């Protein structure tokens, strides 16, 4: 069975990717990060999520991106923006963008893949996020893959899989539902309460709620 490293945050996108990788028959080696993020609820959710899958290993990597901040997710002095309607959502890079986060995460995944002999890495980026998050662009993924194949000692090519890349958020949710993803064990909120209730009006919550609405399905998680 082929091995794959799956980046799993605890959000809806990475949960869908996890289900896709399982459907493709990979031996799953999951990797999550505690990077000092405001939303530690992600890590609690991901531990529940992976119980539903035949995960060979689950690594939680501890790094502290609060060391340089620059994002509302890693600097408590920067407020998470809240909105009233999806039409108010920003079209440029928001303060919730974490500088170089996907580069850091993919670099760790690459190192892990090299150690276990995996030639496939999965990440849940998609182009509907690319206007807000520059490290979700297809050209970024292509460039990272090229770098990875210059930088490692595996021998055969590393492939960075982005199965959601051309999907809108509602398509991602639809795909996950078809694959049996239990979205109850996910959280997308940038600013959850201490008891893991989603705020319902940050950028991530608004996009998520809109996606479930377009699928005529109620989001199974709890909101404030």
Curated annotation (Swiss-Prot):
Keywords: ATP-binding, Ligase, Metal-binding, Nucleotide-binding, Queuosine biosynthesis, Zinc
Pfam family, one: QueC
Annotated residues for binding of Zn(2+): 189, 199, 202, 205
Catalytic activity: 7-carboxy-7-deazaguanine + NH4(+) + ATP = 7-cyano-7-deazaguanine + ADP + phosphate + H2O + H(+)
Residues at which ATP binds: 8-18
Single Gene Ontology MF annotation: ATP binding
Cofactors (names): Zn(2+)
SUPFAM superfamilies on file: Adenine nucleotide alpha hydrolases-like (SSF52402)
Cofactor binding, note field: Binds 1 zinc ion per subunit.
Alphabetical GO biological process terms: queuosine biosynthetic process
Chain's role: Catalyzes the ATP-dependent conversion of 7-carboxy-7-deazaguanine (CDG) to 7-cyano-7-deazaguanine (preQ(0)).
NCBIfam families from the UniProt entry: 7-cyano-7-deazaguanine synthase QueC
Family assignment from sequence similarity: Belongs to the QueC family.
The protein's name in its UniProt record: 7-cyano-7-deazaguanine synthase
Organism: Rickettsia felis (strain ATCC VR-1525 / URRWXCal2)
Taxonomic placement: Bacteria, Pseudomonadati, Pseudomonadota, Alphaproteobacteria, Rickettsiales
Gene that specifies this protein: queC
């Amino acid at each position: 069975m082929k091995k794959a490293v799956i980046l799993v945050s605890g959000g809806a996108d990475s949960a869908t990717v996890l289900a896709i990788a399982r459907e493709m028959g990979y031996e799953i080696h999951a990797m999550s990060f505690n990077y000092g993020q405001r939303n530690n609820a992600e890590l609690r959710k991901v531990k529940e999520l992976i119980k539903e899958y035949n995960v060979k290993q689950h690594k939680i990597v501890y790094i502290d991106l609060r060391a340089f901040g620059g994002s509302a997710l890693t600097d408590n002095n920067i407020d998470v923006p809240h909105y009233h309607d999806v039409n108010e959502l920003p079209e440029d890079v928001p303060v919730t963008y974490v500088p170089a986060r996907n580069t850091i995460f993919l670099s760790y995944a690459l190192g892990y893949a090299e150690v276990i002999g995996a030639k496939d890495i999965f990440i849940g980026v998609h182009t509907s996020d690319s206007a807000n998050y520059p490290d979700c662009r297809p050209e970024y993924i292509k460039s990272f893959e090229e770098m990875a194949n210059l930088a490692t000692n595996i021998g055969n090519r590393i492939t960075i899989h982005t199965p959601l890349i051309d999907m809108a958020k509602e398509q991602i949710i639809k795909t996950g539902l078809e694959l049996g993803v239990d979205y109850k064990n996910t959280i997308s909120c940038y600013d959850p309460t201490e008891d893991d209730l989603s705020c319902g009006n940050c950028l991530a919550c608004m996009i998520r709620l809109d996606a479930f609405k377009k699928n005529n399905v109620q989001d199974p998680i709890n909101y404030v």
